[in-house]
C-alpha cells in the first residue's frame, strides 16, 4: 500500500499528480519527552515498527530526532534529540513519532517563498485509489527552509544543558553549526564546533520572570556570552535579580534567521531567591 501525491498552490484551481510515496512506520509516545539532548522512552500504537532501523531520522511534531536504539519487545526507543535544523523541545505523551527516513513522497515542483502549497495523499490499495475529493488536505507555507542557517548546538548555561536552576553570573555557551558542511551524518547537539557557515552571527535574548524581554545581544560571532548578576539586577527593574529567566538563541545570516531557536527557561537561586527550594546549594 502506498499513495499518489497531488498538490497545488492556494491560487491554483486544480490539483496535479506530482509523484508517489510510501507510508512510513509510526508510533505514539507512551511517556513525555523532556527538553534534553538524549531521551529513552516507550511507545504504543505502533505500525510497521519492525521496518525502523537505527541510524535513521524521525519527526516528533516539528523536531527531528535520530533513532539510536529500538527494542520492539520492550517497546522502547533511544533518541538523539534536535538534529538537522531543529532543537530539542518538550513533547507530551500521545505525541506521534513518524519514522520518515526513506519513506518520503517528493514533489519536484518549484515554489516561491511565501506561497502556500496544498497537498493530498491518495491511498493506493489492491482495491483501487482514494478519490481526490475524499482526501484530506495538508498545507505548508514555503519559508526557504533549505537556505536558512542551522541554529547553534550544544547550548549550555553555566556548563549545564537545559538547567532547572542557575546561580550567579550566567555564562551562556554554544557550538557553531554549518548546514553546508553537515551533509554526511546527523550531528548530535553535544558535538563541538562545525563551521560556522560564512556570515552567520547569533542573537541572544534574555527574558525576565514576568516574561518581558530584558536584554538583547546581536551580531555575536563567538560561542559564549556572559550575563552578570549585576546585569540581571539592573535589567529586572525589581531591585534584585529575576527569580526566573528564559533565554532565546538563534542564528542569523544577513537577515536570514534559523528555522528554529533555542528557548531555555530556568529558575534563579541564591541571594534569597527560592531559598526554600535550594537551601544548601544547587
Language-model segments: which ranges?
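Beta-strand-rich modules
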Residues: 113-132, 229-260
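Surface-exposed loop/edge segments in extracytoplasmic proteins
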Residues: 12-19, 65, 207-218, 257-260
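An aromatic-rich alpha-helical recognition segment common to small helix-rich domains
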Residues: 139-142, 152, 174, 204, ...
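Small/polar beta-strand repeat architecture
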Residues: 66-143
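Leucine-centric amphipathic alpha-helical interface motifs
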Residues: 18, 24, 30, 98-113, ...
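Autoprocessing Asn-cyclization modules and mimics
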Residues: 1-81, 86, 138
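Pro/Thr/Ser/Gly-rich low-complexity, intrinsically disordered linker/stalk tracts
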Residues: 133-185, 191, 254-282
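Recognizes extended acidic, P/S/T-rich segments that occur
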Residues: 104-110, 184-242
Amino acid at each position: 500500500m502506498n499513495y499518489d501525491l497531488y498538490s497545488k498552490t492556494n491560487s491554483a484551481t486544480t490539483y496535479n499528480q506530482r509523484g508517489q510515496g510510501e507510508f512510513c512506520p509510526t508510533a505514539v509516545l507512551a511517556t513525555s519527552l523532556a527538553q534534553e539532548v538524549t531521551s529513552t522512552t516507550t511507545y504504543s500504537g505502533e505500525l510497521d515498527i519492525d521496518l525502523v532501523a537505527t541510524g535513521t531520522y524521525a519527526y516528533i511534531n516539528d523536531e527531528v530526532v535520530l533513532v539510536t536504539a529500538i527494542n520492539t519487545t520492550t517497546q522502547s526507543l533511544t533518541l538523539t534529540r534536535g538534529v538537522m535544523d531543529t532543537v530539542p523541545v518538550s513533547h507530551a505523551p500521545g505525541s506521534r513519532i513518524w519514522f520518515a527516513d526513506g519513506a518520503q513522497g517528493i514533489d519536484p515542483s518549484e515554489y516561491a517563498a511565501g506561497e502556500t502549497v496544498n497537498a493530498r495523499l491518495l491511498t493506493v490499495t489492491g482495491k483501487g485509489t482514494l478519490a481526490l475529493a475524499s482526501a484530506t488536505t495538508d498545507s505548508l507555507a514555503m519559508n526557504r527552509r533549505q537556505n536558512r542557517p542551522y541554529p547553534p548546538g550544544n547550548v549550555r548555561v553555566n556548563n549545564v544543558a537545559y538547567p532547572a536552576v542557575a546561580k550567579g553570573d550566567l555564562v551562556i555557551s554554544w557550538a557553531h553549526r554549518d548546514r553546508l558542511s553537515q551533509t554526511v551524518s546527523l550531528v548530535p547537539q553535544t558535538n563541538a564546533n562545525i563551521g560556522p557557515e560564512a556570515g552567520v552571527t547569533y542573537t541572544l535574548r534574555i527574558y525576565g520572570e514576568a516574561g518581558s524581554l530584558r536584554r538583547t545581544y546581536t551580531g555575536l560571532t563567538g560561542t559564549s556570552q556572559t550575563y552578570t548578576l549585576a546585569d540581571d539586577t539592573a535589567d529586572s527593574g525589581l531591585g534584585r535579580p529575576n527569580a526566573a529567566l528564559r533565554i532565546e538563541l538563534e542564528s542569523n545570516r544577513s537577515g536570514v534567521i534559523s528555522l528554529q531557536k533555542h528557548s531555555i527557561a530556568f529558575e534563579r537561586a541564591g541571594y534569597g531567591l527560592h531559598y526554600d527550594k535550594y537551601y544548601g546549594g544547587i
